[in-house]
Amino acid sequence: TEDLPVDVRFMLPSCVPATPMDESGANLDYRAIDSFYDYPRVQGLAEMMNSYGVIHNDAEVVSKIVASQAHHKKIDGHAPDLVGNDLNAYIAAGVYSDHECHDLNDAIAKLQRGQFIMIREGTAARNLEALVPLLCDKYVERCMFCTDDKHPNDLLEKGHIDYIVKKAISLGADPIMAVKAAGYTAA
């Protein structure tokens, strides 16, 4: 991607297969992904979906987290509906961000514990309307926009992050806060 006109960065998959019952055609354990951390465009570990494994110290999950941390990389989360001590354990393990916030209380609980929140507005899952109040002085420094599973037709017809900025403003967000979540915080 070095010669592309856009600066593309990557996150390594954390859960392939997604669950032990899935058949993905591959099993990417920590040894399979470890050498990829040396690539400068690799930013960290993507979507740590196995929250149960994080909370209960599953050896493979912990190995992936430790490897990412050893390379000074970020760990993105995927933790819908975690609360209380389970949420504390998940975040304390080093999971840096989450895009699975379905309501304002969930997002604020994660922000108060130090996570960054990716406000998702994709094709299947749309959380912007519920989370637009986060686009304020108190929270915007830890909030950014993401699409997560946006269909190519939606990208062509509506746009990407630019669409989310416009929609956030139409929902009452301060334009400066919307632009900040689109660019500054994400960078």
Please name every model-derived segment:
Residues 45, 110, 178:
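Conserved, mostly hydrophobic/aromatic
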Residues 8-12, 43-47, 75-77, 97-99, ...:
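Hydrophobic faces of well-ordered beta-strands that scaffold small-molecule active sites
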Residues 41-42, 72, 89-97, 112-118, ...:
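Glycine-enriched alpha-helix->loop->beta-strand junction motifs that scaffold or abut catalytic
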